[in-house]
């Protein structure tokens, strides 16, 4: 099953938390969900050059806090905060709730699966060889200290008549192990030959429970 499902969704409630954190019932749940989807799409489109890795949302009463994880916070914040003020004003027009924006920097974009996928997609659109782009991204991730990385690229590679999928991986990526911290990202690249799809899995190590950490300490002592 670990091979087929989204590895982040599989681990929610085990070692991962939800990107949208709020509680609602009935019609309010429906409205909140659709508003989250609409806001995420707007922010991803608006900040497509800012290297946005993740957008989290928290709600309380009539307030919504949006946490944007980005590799280029300066692009979002702008000179003297003018960028984030303008962005907040635009987001506020899309929701009746009071909006609060929080910007978090992704210090190691080479270790973030979503940013790696988008980086490769951008390189393919610039007509860089897909093999070269994949190998470069894998080398950067391994150098950064990941425990394993796997990339799948699908489409009319090298302009071939028939679409195919290619896999590149380095070290292990244990998809079936729920305590394994696996990041996952997808992206699409619009090339002259059609759309190239990308999927990236990055294994960062195991997340142990407090009990497991205590037991491991006893074994070492």
Curated annotation (Swiss-Prot):
Stated role: Binds the lower part of the 30S subunit head. Binds mRNA in the 70S ribosome, positioning it for translation.
This protein's encoding gene: rpsC
GO molecular function: mRNA binding; rRNA binding; structural constituent of ribosome
Domain KH type-2: 39-107
One GO term of the biological process aspect: translation
Record's signal peptide: none
InterPro entries registered for this protein in UniProt: KH_dom (IPR004087), KH_dom-like_a/b (IPR015946), KH_dom_type_2 (IPR004044), KH_sf_prok-type (IPR009019), Ribosomal_S3_C_sf (IPR036419), Ribosomal_uS3_bac-typ (IPR005704), Ribosomal_uS3_C (IPR001351)
Protein name, UniProt field: Small ribosomal subunit protein uS3
Protein keywords: Ribonucleoprotein, Ribosomal protein, RNA-binding, rRNA-binding
Cellular component aspect of the GO annotation: cytosolic small ribosomal subunit
Subunit-structure text: Part of the 30S ribosomal subunit. Forms a tight complex with proteins S10 and S14.
SUPFAM superfamilies: Prokaryotic type KH domain (KH-domain type II), Ribosomal protein S3 C-terminal domain
Family, as annotated: Belongs to the universal ribosomal protein uS3 family.
Gene3D superfamilies: 3.30.300.20, Ribosomal protein S3, C-terminal domain (3.30.1140.32)
UniProt keyword annotation of Ribosomal protein present: yes
UniProt lineage: Bacteria, Pseudomonadati, Bdellovibrionota, Bdellovibrionia, Bdellovibrionales
Provenance organism: Bdellovibrio bacteriovorus (strain ATCC 15356 / DSM 50701 / NCIMB 9529 / HD100)
